[in-house]
Amino acid sequence: MAVGKEIKTKIASVKGTQKITSAMEMVAASKMRKAQEGMAASRPYATNIRNVIGHIALGNLEYRHPYMDEREAKRVGYIVVSSDRGLCGGLNINLFKKVLADAAEKQASGAEVEFCVIGSKATAFFNNMGAKVSAQISGLGDSPSLTDLVGSVAVMLKAYDNGEIDRLHVVYNKFVNTMTQEPTIDQLLPLPKSDDEAISHRWDYIYEPDANSLLDQLLVRYIESQVYQGVVENIACEQASRMVSMKAATDNAGDLIDDLQLVYNKARQAAITQELGEIVAGAAAVG
């Protein structure tokens, strides 16, 4: 029964793949929980510093930092955060589609675009399409630190300081829940004003030793913290997407095994029926 042996070989192969995807699902679930903890730990800082910066942008400062001034958007920079590994569904490609659509709108209005890419998937994608990539970094692992990102962020900040770009955005996947990851584009520069436009009065802070030196450091740290938060959120999204993808692959493998087992049983039944028929026919001929 050559057909039966071939089917059994396929079943064994699919079972082997199912074991791999099941193990990857469990690993991704464990890493996702760890990534969620890191994301939850850093999110309050990122949120609060964003609120502080928003109020500073609305304040009446004697010293106007260049990051607060609106410019005509002739050149736009994107810091794109992706994963280093695949097998995470459409996480990366959905993000790339969103940033390319936004970049196309900017280019349609006459602006130039350039990219700083984080993660090997974004590095490969934007280099292969011939985009202008000003900085790139990959291999950050599952627990990156802020210092890992400082160099790449500094390249884009220097470009902004030199007037080489007029807008700076960070693009990442925002973690909503295990089943939902939302591609997000946040403006970093010029500083976005506070979302609370309905506040009845404006206030300013007291700066020690002076506004100039403090804001120079604070605003750079703000940009770095927002990019870091995007990286941390993206890691949580990556693990959640991988867990869901591997669960789907495991379930599909189970369905395929059931289908192959049914085909095998039918083939075996047909072979037995044929053998019985041959035996009966042979006995009748002898008799």
Curated annotation (Swiss-Prot):
GO CC terms: plasma membrane; proton-transporting ATP synthase complex
Record-linked SUPFAM superfamilies: ATP synthase (F1-ATPase), gamma subunit (SSF52943)
InterPro entries, sorted: ATP_synth_F1_ATPase_gsu, ATP_synth_F1_gsu, ATP_synth_F1_gsu_CS
Protein's membrane topology: Peripheral membrane protein
Keyword Transport: yes
MF GO annotations: ATP binding; proton-transporting ATP synthase activity, rotational mechanism
Transmembrane intervals: none
Name of a matching Pfam family: ATP-synt
Keywords of this entry: ATP synthesis, Cell inner membrane, Cell membrane, CF(1), Hydrogen ion transport, Ion transport, Membrane, Transport
Primary location group: membrane
Entry's localization field: Cell inner membrane
Any GO BP annotation: proton motive force-driven plasma membrane ATP synthesis
Repeat as UniProt keyword: no
Function description: Produces ATP from ADP in the presence of a proton gradient across the membrane. The gamma chain is believed to be important in regulating ATPase activity and the flow of protons through the CF(0) complex.
Family named by the database record: Belongs to the ATPase gamma chain family.
Subunit structure: F-type ATPases have 2 components, CF(1) - the catalytic core - and CF(0) - the membrane proton channel. CF(1) has five subunits: alpha(3), beta(3), gamma(1), delta(1), epsilon(1). CF(0) has three main subunits: a, b and c.
Name this protein carries in UniProt: ATP synthase gamma chain
